[in-house]
Amino acid sequence: MEPEIPPNTGAIARLCAATGTVLNLVEPLGFKLDDRSLKRAGLDYWHQVTWRTWPNWAALQTANPEARYYFLTTKGTKSYTQAKFGPEDFLVFGRETKGLPTTLLRENERQCLTIPMLNPGVRSLNLATATAIVLFEALRQVKAV
């Protein structure tokens, strides 16, 4: 949701291409979709990525009213390993600098997940790294890998 750094989004796009998952980008984006660094991070896999852009969070939810959403946040208390993922679930990640909006987290507290940090001096992981960790756990659970 509202990604800011093109190379992170490019790396996530490549991850989505490799796993056959859909990349949903919620605007505003911190870059243009034709950004060189975005394309470079996705390498030559962009044609294999199924992706959509949404003008805002409400538009994505309206188009997917039956979907279940998991919100990844450093403020969560439930580990991503405790979730029971399904094949149609959405994994929602926030901006690199601010994460997800506090109001969204409050409204969806039961669906908030975190990646536990073993070193309390480290606040969070890189967005693309966090996405890969949680996505592969979700795919493992639905037996896609």
Model-derived regions, located:
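Post-transcriptional modification and biogenesis factors for structured RNAs
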Residues: M1-V145
